[in-house]
């Protein structure tokens, strides 16, 4: 069976995602579509607006199999996010990765990916990182290509292509040009497509404009968001006040010395927004800070990080997805494709199980990795 993989967050699922999934199926000429989806926390450094099981149900309106991207990938920079996603795709024997980008030229993106692999070995690159320059800024300076590197989906697409060259050279790539709204546009403009940011805002404010930009057949699944990033503040404050500096230093993604800034600024902040504002500097971007704060919230340490894939958590599937899973188990009997988390399989997913427990504290949800059955359609 030939498969196409989509690396996703679906926070929440909308018409742009449906467009991407539909074109990916058509252009890849594959039998099955697989979504590798972030769980209860997403790459922007915040809890997803809906539980991963609800988002799986939404996703199955367009794909055949949904698996969870390991938490370490979700709360990392684009390169680590991409590395873990591509390694997960490889574990699933995916043939083609399809990603959205602002550029229609796969050739240009592949050329930049190859250049970047070389540049990252260069002493100048490491020196610029030490100076506190952001990753996209360094790359645009070194490659002299501002246009392609100004777009977030291009940057992520290049990270996928780099990871494929390094870890899965047999895998093919396909890019679908994004349609409609800009990535971070805050208002729905009544066109068929809108950004995830604008849809989340509409749902939070009880504004019905979101109905114009999500598929009709799954609109009954949408409701007020389960939680927001502001809900994390009391828990983060508790962690920052009670943990010794040495423990904070061991938190995943914390750069040398940032733990001092965290412990200083928490006493000057009365909300997540004010903490973020107090922490921001030229060196530390908002997204970096938010990911650090989520790792503090979840107490994910550097020792918890494993970039190798030893098992895959299956969240949901259609009949076609079920057939593909059967194919995988027959062809890779030593791999672990887990549809039911229990005491025997829980050790593969310690970080994800912890993230679900914390998400439930934030959102008053009750679906855990142990009591929630596989989503089937």
From Swiss-Prot:
Keywords: ATP-binding, Cytoplasm, Ligase, Nucleotide-binding, RNA-binding, tRNA processing, tRNA-binding
Annotated residues for binding of ATP: 7-20, 100, 153, 178
EC number(s) stated in the UniProt entry for this protein: 6.3.4.-
Enzyme class: ligase
Catalysed reaction equations from the record: cytidine(34) in elongator tRNA(Met) + acetate + ATP = N(4)-acetylcytidine(34) in elongator tRNA(Met) + AMP + diphosphate
GO molecular function: ATP binding; ligase activity, forming carbon-nitrogen bonds; tRNA binding
GO cellular component labels: cytoplasm
Compartmental location: Cytoplasm
A single BP term in Gene Ontology: tRNA modification
Annotated family: Belongs to the TmcAL family.
HAMAP family per UniProt: TmcAL
Protein purpose: Catalyzes the formation of N(4)-acetylcytidine (ac(4)C) at the wobble position of elongator tRNA(Met), using acetate and ATP as substrates. First activates an acetate ion to form acetyladenylate (Ac-AMP) and then transfers the acetyl group to tRNA to form ac(4)C34.
Record protein name field: tRNA(Met) cytidine acetate ligase
Species of the source: Staphylococcus epidermidis (strain ATCC 12228 / FDA PCI 1200)
Lineage: Bacteria, Bacillati, Bacillota, Bacilli, Bacillales
Chain's gene name: tmcAL
């Amino acid at each position: 069976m030939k498969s196409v993989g989509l690396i996703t967050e679906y926070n929440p699922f909308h018409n742009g995602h449906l467009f991407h999934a539909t074109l990916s199926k058509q252009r890849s000429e594959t039998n099955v579509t697989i979504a590798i989806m972030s769980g209860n926390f997403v790459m922007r450094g915040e809890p997803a607006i809906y539980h991963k099981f609800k988002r799986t149900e939404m996703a199955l309106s367009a794909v055949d199999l949904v698996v969870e991207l390991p938490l370490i990938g979700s709360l990392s920079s684009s390169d680590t996010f991409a590395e873990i996603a591509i390694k997960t795709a490889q574990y699933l024997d995916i043939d083609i990765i399809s990603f959205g980008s602002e550029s229609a030229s796969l050739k240009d993106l592949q050329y930049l990916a190859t250049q970047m692999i070389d540049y990252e070995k260069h002493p100048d690159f490491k020196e610029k990182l030490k100076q506190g320059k952001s990753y996209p800024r360094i790359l645009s300076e070194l490659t002299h290509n501002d246009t392609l590197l100004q777009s977030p989906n291009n940057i992520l697409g290049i990270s996928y292509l780099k990871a494929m060259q390094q870890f899965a050279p047999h895998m093919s790539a396909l890019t679908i040009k994004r349609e409609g709204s800009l990535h971070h546009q805050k208002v729905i403009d009544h066109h068929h497509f809108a950004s995830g940011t604008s849809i989340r805002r509409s749902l939070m404010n009880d504004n019905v404009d979101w109905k114009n930009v999500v598929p009709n057949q799954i609109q009954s699944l949408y409701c007020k968001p389960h939680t927001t990033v502001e809900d994390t503040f009391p828990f983060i404050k508790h962690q920052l006040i009670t943990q010794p500096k040495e423990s904070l230093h061991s938190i995943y993604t914390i750069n040398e010395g940032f733990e001092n800034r965290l412990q200083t600024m928490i006493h000057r902040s009365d909300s997540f927004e004010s903490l973020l504002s107090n922490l921001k500097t030229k060196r530390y971007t908002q997204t970096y800070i938010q990911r650090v704060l989520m790792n503090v919230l979840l107490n994910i340490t550097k020792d918890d990080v494993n970039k190798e894939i030893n098992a895959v958590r299956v969240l949901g599937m259609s009949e076609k997805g079920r057939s593909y899973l059967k194919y995988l188990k027959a062809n890779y009997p030593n791999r672990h494709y887990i549809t039911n988390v229990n005491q025997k399989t829980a050790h593969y997913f310690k970080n994800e199980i912890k993230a679900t427990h914390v998400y439930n504290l934030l959102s008053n949800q009750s679906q855990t990795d142990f009591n929630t059955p596989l989503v089937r359609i």
